[in-house]
Each structure stands twice: as structure tokens, then as C-alpha cells.
Swiss-Prot record:
GO cellular component: plasma membrane
Family under the similarity heading: To M.leprae ML0030.
Keyword Glycosyltransferase carried by entry: no
Keyword presence, Cell membrane: yes
Cell compartment(s), UniProt: Cell membrane
Bilayer topology annotation: Multi-pass membrane protein
Source organism of the structure: Mycobacterium tuberculosis (strain CDC 1551 / Oshkosh)
Transmembrane segments: 1-21, 33-53, 54-74
Keyword annotations: Cell membrane, Membrane, Transmembrane, Transmembrane helix
Protein name as annotated: Uncharacterized protein MT0044
Amino acid sequence: MFLAGVLCMCAAAASALFGSWSLCHTPTADPTALALRAMAPTQLAAAVMLAAGGVVAVAAPGHTALMVVIVCIAGAVGTLAAGSWQSAQYALRRETASPTANCVGSCAVCTQACH
């Protein structure tokens, strides 16, 4: 279980690093950067779950540690999946709501002023 604990802690550190990196960048209108920034809170939550699983894997008895590690990994993966889905939906909604999204290059029939 020691190896599983170390791997969980390394995954937690990587997730926390990517989450912090996403939060440190300035907000932009780019949908990809927006989706990455929206993923940061779920990455940090997954990092906390993985760190807890890693600590329990190192400190607790074998059977208990195995159960907790499985639950923590499943929770972290589920959190990242739900966060990806939500941030992608948010970025798409924001992109379609922008006023420049209606201008698709057909200037001959356009009645709007160019931005």
C-alpha cells in the first residue's frame, strides 16, 4: 500500500499544480483558456481527495487503506469528469452568447456594425 500511497500523493501534487497553474493565468476570452480556468477548482478538489487517499494508504492498515484509496480515486476521477463536463458547457455557452459569435463572415447580408 506504500506504493499506492506515494502514487496518489504524486497524482495529487500534479493535479494541484495544474489547478494552480490554471488559476494563475489572467482571464481571457479564448474558450480553451476559459475552459481550463473553469477546471481549476475541480482539479484542486481532486488533489485534496487524492492526497487524503495517499495519506490513508501510507498510514492505515491494509484492508482499510485499500477501501479508502479506491473510494478516493473514484471520487477524484468522478469529480474531474463532472468538472470537465461543466466547464465545457460553460465555455460553449459563453462562446455562443458573445456578440461576435453571430458574425460568421457573411458580410453581404449582415446588418450589424463590424466590431
